[in-house]
Amino acid sequence: MPALTSTKNKTKDLTHGPIGRQLFWFSLPLFAGSLIQQFYSTVDLIFVGRVLGKDAAAAVGASTFIIIIILGFFIGLSVGIGVIAAREFARGEFENLSRVVHCTAGLTIIFSIVFTILGIIFAPSVLELMNTPPEIMHWGTVYIRLFMLSLFSIVSYNVGSGILRALGNSLSPMIYQLIGGIANVIGNFLFVYYWNFGISGSAMATVVSQTLAAGLVIYHLYNMDARYCLRFKKITLDLPLAREIFRIGIPAAIQTIVITLSNIVVQTNINGLGVNSIAAYAAYFKVENVIYLPIMALGQACSTFISQNVGVGKIMRSKRGTAISIYFGLAVTAVSISLVLFFADFAFGMFTDDAEVIAIGSSIAFVIMPFYFLYVFLEVLASSIRGSGSTLPTMFIILVNMCVIRIGVLKLIMYFNPTADGVAWVYPITWVFTVACLYWYYRSERWNPVKVLAKPAV
């Protein structure tokens, strides 16, 4: 079967060619794109923290998990969409691929409207449940409500980019996100610093930048290969296809939401430690991206690689791709951990001038980051299993380990050592259990459709 490569659309068949080189070059734009996407919120936090103070920065940090849990649903659906799109592309089934594109557009429109309304209505209630301090409650509510106005754009960009990645194109989404990132910096300067719109200006800058990036992705989808390009008159809810997307995507969505819910429980306990700890953790999660984003990019690349290769029955090539992704991840993580820990005070000083917040943030980093190599195995193995279309087992593994066990460990820590450092130990402890379960499942090959189909009926 010839490689399905289009110069015009930058699509690429990942079922042929040198695996290491393909994963490396495919993951680089993914890393850059994720870095730019996180840059949005990082710039928000820098402007808010420097111009408006640590209370405003804490309000943004306390709002983060609410925003993530809403996006988690769509991220999960995009997994299902990506697996199916990559499979149909690798098989050359372009009519089915067109159905995926247009069903995805219909789902995006409907669910974006519903979640936007719910987010705006229930923002204050959820912040109260999270034990958010009264002094930052108002600004947290304002930030969430304004941010929700960009939900359709954020979802459109991420889902549309997921389709492009499934077709082997990771470069174009990165370029569009870069353009949006530049707009975000300009918007923050104008709305927050120059026009003094406060935390509302930070959210407004995000709305403008995300809308621009989403518009570029939609334009790209509209101008793809005529056999599967987006046409607005074809947008529909293909119920059989939607059920298949939900079959794969809903477990992935639940997995994402479960992780976020468990982190909300963690954040709730952090909120009880005071504004300094809240601000320190908000800054830590930004600093952590230097390590996390390359791992996430490798996971995304591995998932697309697996989806295409499993789709055409190349199981051994899929396994080699998983192993190479882990090797790459360990090498990159070793370097990034060393840099972050060596320059910890400088990194946290980017977000605040408060010496106590910097000290707490650095202490958190020295607890968690030495164990971050575990997250390489977690991300790559989970992405590989999801890429095969087997999302239900990973959901159960994540549910048990990163929700039930994590909350149990947290309760013990808050009883014996209720400090910011104590809370930090929750992450490496639960990573150990999660990686052990994922490794067992991967080695069992229950995800392998060839092996499963070859089993005799009982």
Language-model segments: residues:
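Short alpha-helical transmembrane segments in multi-pass integral membrane proteins
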Residues: M1-S27, A85-S150, Y194-I250, I306-F371, ...
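N-terminal transmembrane alpha-helices
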Residues: L14-V51, F65-G80, I84, I109-T116, ...
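Transmembrane helical elements of multi-pass membrane transporters/channels
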Residues: W25-D44, L146, Y157, G180, ...
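Transmembrane alpha-helix boundary and packing residues in multipass membrane permease domains
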Residues: L30, S34, I46, V83, ...
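Helix-terminus/linker motif at the lipid-water interface of multi-pass membrane proteins
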Residues: F39-A57, L127-P134, L190-F197, I257-V290, ...
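Small-residue hotspots at the loop-to-helix junctions and early N-terminal turns
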Residues: K54-F65, I144, A203, V275-V290, ...
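Small-residue-rich hydrophobic transmembrane alpha-helices
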Residues: A57-I117, I154-P173, A280-A344, Y375-I398
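Short runs within selected transmembrane alpha-helices of multi-pass transporters and secretion channels
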Residues: S78, L146-R165, P173-N184, S202-V217, ...
